[in-house]
Amino acid sequence: MGTERAKERAARFAASLVEDGMIVGLGSGSTAELAVRALGERLHDGLRLIGVATSQRTAALARRVGIELRDPDSVDRIDLAIDGADEVEERSLGLLKGRGGALVREKLVARMARRLVIIIDDSKLVAALGARFPLPVEVVPFGWRWCARWLEDLGGRPTLRCRPTGHPFRSDNGNLILDVAFGAIADPAWLDRTIKMLPGVIDHGLFLDMADLVIVGSETGIRLLERSRTVSETSKS
């Protein structure tokens, strides 16, 4: 219950940052979905916005709450993107994302956005990325076992993501996901560049130098971590 309330606090604060007429990137995952619902509530108060969804699941939810959607190729900007994260390294605001399988579209929308706002509960703060979760890597199906071997050569332990049925998980782009356990990543920037150079890799879940604001929800309030490294606190519920 405490974690859900923390997420709700962060999501509602993020939704309050959206101004009338904005084009908003809508992230994927349980925390981002709370922000989508909060934006839907604001529509009843007269807020006008256009959403760009990062997954089919998010798009379906946005439509249900009344948010008008556009394709990323039909907009000339994204004013603000709101998304969650699996891990946030507090000093650099580096992110590890992709457990929901939408990392490629999330990264594209995050890069398009003039401002990227990340919402998490305080359990997602880590001293080093990769300390708690494996790094998702999206690869083309053709030759994926070779991609796994090359990731092993980099010190990772890749596992093909599968559904409960045992069938391989497919991203909305039709690709496979390798969850690669590296442990605490000593040099995220090097790993970022190196994995992207592997043939067959579409992208991975390291989002470095992208977050402008991280909203950290807790049982007592929220904490704001900004790119400038300044930190403020509020007990807004």
Swiss-Prot record:
The protein's name in its UniProt record: Ribose-5-phosphate isomerase A
HAMAP family: Rib_5P_isom_A
Catalytic activity as recorded in UniProt: aldehydo-D-ribose 5-phosphate = D-ribulose 5-phosphate
InterPro entries, A to Z: NagB/RpiA_transferase-like, Ribose-5P_isomerase, Ribose5P_isomerase_typA_subgr, Ribose5P_isomerase_type_A
Binding site for substrate: S28, G29, S30, T31, D83, G84, A85, D86, K97, G98, R99, G100, K124
Species of provenance: Thermomicrobium roseum (strain ATCC 27502 / DSM 5159 / P-2)
Annotated NCBIfam families: PRK00702.1 (NF001924), rpiA (TIGR00021)
One GO molecular-function entry: ribose-5-phosphate isomerase activity
